[in-house]
């Protein structure tokens, strides 16, 4: 393989003709269905969840709320775990959370015998929230004095400082930014605003996963970014 050579992708024909098997094609017919209840507020705390009516839906197998799961935290990026704290993702997310930080945060889950039963159960759940003002811009997050996460009181969960040199090349900057407009000939970008469109991988596979027991282990089958 080299420059100017056209190399066919091994799975291209199978993907465009529908012959390729995706994760959703591999789910067993008798598998239970899990669905997640998402928050309808952007910032606040879940005070109570009433699941009594949801349990009355035929086919419901189990219901879990943010009050039923451990307070274990994990990172959401899916990168390999590093034992070096400087090179690992921030673990600040619970599988179901009482502290809502964005519209759509996961607060409860339903397991049922069918997709329809799971959806009806979600619609029957009643949630009592204590809503807080949403912080919708970086400026609001910085000056509000309201921490979005207890581990990041300044609302900076992560930070990458970079500069643009005289040749318009972007470089990461490891030092401390000063109030001067330039640092050694580099432009200080703190006062500059950038607007970018929404990003999407444009994958052709639905977002889903399934799991099954193998002895005492749980095997999870999920898509990746390949």
Question: Where on the chain are the PLM-derived regions?
Answer:
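Conserved beta-alpha junction segments in alpha/beta enzyme cores
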Residues: 175-226
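Conserved NAD(P)+-binding/catalytic subdomain of aldehyde/semialdehyde dehydrogenases
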Residues: 170
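Flexible, low-hydrophobicity surface segments
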Residues: 1-162
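Generic structural signal for well-ordered, non-membrane alpha-helical segments
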Residues: 9, 47, 93, 111, ...
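Short, low-to-moderate order helix/coil transition modules at the start of elongated helical scaffolds
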Residues: 16, 173-175
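Non-catalytic surface loops within mature trypsin-like serine protease
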Residues: 39-41, 166, 196, 215
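Basic- and hydrophobic-enriched, low-structure N-terminal and domain-boundary segments
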Residues: 161-167, 176-177
């Amino acid at each position: 393989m080299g420059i100017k050579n056209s190399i066919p992708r091994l799975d291209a024909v199978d993907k465009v003709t529908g012959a390729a098997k995706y994760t959703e094609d591999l789910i067993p017919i008798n598998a239970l269905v899990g669905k997640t209840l998402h928050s309808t507020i952007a910032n606040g705390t879940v005070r109570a969840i009433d699941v009594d009516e949801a349990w009355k839906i035929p086919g419901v197998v189990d219901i879990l709320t943010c009050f039923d799961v451990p307070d274990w935290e994990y990172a959401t990026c899916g990168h390999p775990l590093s034992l070096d704290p400087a090179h690992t993702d921030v673990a600040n997310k619970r599988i179901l959370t009482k502290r809502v930080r964005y519209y759509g945060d996961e607060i409860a889950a339903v397991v049922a015998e069918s997709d329809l039963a799971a959806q009806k159960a979600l619609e029957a759940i009643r949630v009592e929230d204590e809503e807080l003002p949403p912080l919708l811009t970086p400026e609001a997050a910085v000056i509000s004095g309201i921490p979005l996460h207890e581990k990041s009181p300044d609302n900076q969960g992560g930070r990458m400082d970079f500069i643009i040199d005289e040749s318009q090349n972007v470089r990461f900057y490891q030092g401390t930014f000063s109030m001067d407009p330039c640092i050694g000939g580099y432009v200080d970008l703190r006062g500059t605003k950038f607007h970018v469109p929404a990003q999407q991988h444009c994958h052709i596979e639905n977002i889903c996963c399934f799991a099954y027991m193998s002895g005492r282990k749980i095997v999870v089958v999920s898509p990746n970014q390949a």
